[in-house]
Amino acid sequence: MLIDPQCIYSVRALQQLQSYVESGRLQVSVIPVSVLDPEDGGQSTRSALALLSRPAGELVSAWQAGNVTGTPSPDAPDRLRANLAIAEAIHLQGTPTFIWRKPDGTEGRLDGIPTSVEELVASVGS
């Protein structure tokens, strides 16, 4: 799940999926990018850098708690550049964007908030 930490749609999408994640039906990897800088005066980059400075196991909980401030770690800019390279490679249109491998081996993709969380979870399979 590619997200912009300042994107309300990314927040809502994760909230929709939370019960599936907690029940073990779905595993979500959150990849912070910064695409809203022109609209938020650079806050997206600052927030993404703060999240990427956290240990991997704390990134999502920090984002959910709105804890997206702090001094970036030395490797955070490189991690953000790598995430932005992923975004460019997949021609990211906005956030959230979901990419997954379907049970039949094909790629699944959803740009935006899922209209049917059940369909998304079923498409991901196990």
Locations of the language-model features?
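Alpha-helical scaffold elements lining the catalytic groove of polysaccharide deacetylases
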Residues: G70-R79, N83
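C-terminal structured interaction module
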Residues: N83-I99
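Short, charged/polar low-complexity linear motifs in solvent-exposed/disordered segments
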Residues: Q27-V28, D78, G125-S126
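Non-catalytic, surface beta->alpha helical segment in thiol-disulfide oxidoreductase systems
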Residues: I99-S126
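Structural alpha/beta surface segment adjacent to cysteine/selenocysteine redox centers
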Residues: M1-S73, E88, Q93
